[in-house]
Amino acid sequence: ETGAAEEAARRIAKLPSLSLVGLHSHIGSQIFDSSGFEVAAGRIVALAQRLHEEQGIDIAELNLGGGMGIAYVDSDDPINVADMAAQIGRIVSRACSDAGIDEPTLAFEPGRAIVGPAGITLYEVGTIKPVELDSGVFRTYVSVDDGMSDNIRTALYGAEYSVRLASRSSSAPPMLCRVVGKHCESGDVVVRDAWLPEDLAPGDLLAVA
């Protein structure tokens, strides 16, 4: 802790046009373990206690932010947001009681956890090209009609996604390929390793989630 939050609170307390009503934290993104939120809850209640005791400021709301992860691939194991919120609520209630301060409203920002599982991106297949690698093996590149301009996460973070042929069914054997975008950039990768039917053709639609 740097003390920056307490300094900001002191400045707000001196301004008659402002009222400090809440504290906010953000611990990260695509989180699959609730322990970080539990630590943040304890620290933010401790800060609320200091503000109450040292400056007479009563905090009405604690916002622990978002970052709850969702399942992009089968190995991802998301937090149950409702269960986590109930657990954090108990932690905050107990911590406030121990600190001798009123229990504030507890808020979260589970944006991706709510809307992410409902969203699918559709791409149209363009060029399909086997490319020989240095080892003498071939990798099939499947280009699509967009890429890093609508989703930069693969290039920046190495994010992984699931991809399926969406416009038709196919009984063709699967082939290992790399789905790439349309931009003039070597890092424009949509899905790094994807198993798609060998009869994949330009004009097919791929669903990425």
Language-model features, listed with the residues they occupy:
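A broadly tuned preference for mixed-charge, low-complexity surface segments
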Residues: 18-34, 72-80, 162-165, 171, ...
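Short linear functional motifs in flexible/disordered or boundary regions
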Residues: 35, 56, 74-76, 100, ...
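Active-site-proximal beta-alpha core segment in soluble small-molecule metabolic enzymes
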Residues: 1-61, 70, 91, 96, ...
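Glycine-rich and small/hydrophobic secondary-structure elements
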Residues: 79-96
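Active-site beta-loop-alpha junctions enriched in small/polar residues
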Residues: 25-32, 62, 67-69, 73, ...
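Charged (often Lys/Glu-rich) extended helix/loop segments that serve as interaction or gating elements
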Residues: 87, 93, 101-209
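Short glycine/threonine-rich loop-to-helix capping motif typified by GTGT followed
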Residues: 33-40, 71-84, 115-127, 193-196
